[in-house]
């Protein structure tokens, strides 16, 4: 059984309700947080390389990212799961992995895949290359301590404790065999996490995607807190991204105090039912979103995917709906396709500056009522009087649908309408905005009062 099947089996919890009510209070922080003041944008290797990416493939993608995507704000380059596994084979995991580790049970890049990591260099040489391109560098971590470190009972750096002293062998990931959980009540447990993030800091890591964190949330919360403390102790700012979902809505206050972004669903792939389900999740999480705290609808499975075997299955309308929803809901924008095969249509989808401005520079983003399978979101531009309106036809019927939005809901009477995707002014309307949308299609308008 592969990761996706195991995730689905482990997370058959159902969607949360469609209510967006929350008693959440803003997290106490400065008005402009140092980490992730806007939704993070970047690239991640999972959708295109699974567990198998090599140094050569990584650098090739980073160079293309710097040239084609960085000018539009995509600046976090992340190597996903099992970079420490020399025999990693794809979307399935080896049942008895042999991870590359140091003498203290800390994971190291597999030298057969990342040759620059030898002689203790770790990811520092790749980080240096990525930084030289003007990008930030991120890596993936699994929750816990390697099972092999526990089997060998390796000593924890800087103390008298060993791996077996802190391992919780009852706490295991249901879909990956690499790690045991860490019992944070044990002496030496925080020392281990501190040592891991100190190693990442020595490599100049900027972003950590930490997996197997959100389910079961309450059981794993001590390790979420441990990772947060370890980053603070490392002395290096690192964005902490928690995965997979879905994170329980009831844990929203806790998660946003300890991470900059967190997944609201299982792995998201290019299938319409999954995209349709994200509407409810993003609606539910809207009240917890604020600068430096971002509910994450997952990566953008666009372009060439799954180890080069296929291209994105979404229709052009569905791809635009994906980008429109992620933008108006201010989800992080993390491209997942192999950039070596970046086609003009996908590049255009990712680099529309007017659409990206909605994601990066808007406020008061909120969902409106669901009426006959038409989803509606509105927002304000960060500066000026412009409002944003996104309308979505999520119906699975074949017929197109007439959609309408009464301007009175925004306290407006007459507006100039601009189609942000077409980058074209549509003229002035009074009273309401109307359009015809095909099934699974969407629109994104800028509305300027007149």
Segments (PLM) and residue ranges:
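Carbohydrate-binding surface patches
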Residues: 320, 326-329, 334-336, 370-410
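Catalytic cores of secreted or luminal carbohydrate-active enzymes
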Residues: 324-367
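C-terminal beta-strand-rich structural cap/linker in extracellular carbohydrate-active enzymes
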Residues: 429-450
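Aromatic-lined carbohydrate-binding/catalytic grooves of carbohydrate-active enzymes
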Residues: 68-126, 133-194, 198-201, 205-207, ...
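Glycan-recognition surfaces
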Residues: 167-171, 184-185, 191, 233-338
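Structural recognition of the beta-strand scaffold that forms the well-ordered cores
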Residues: 40-45, 75-80, 137-140, 206-211, ...
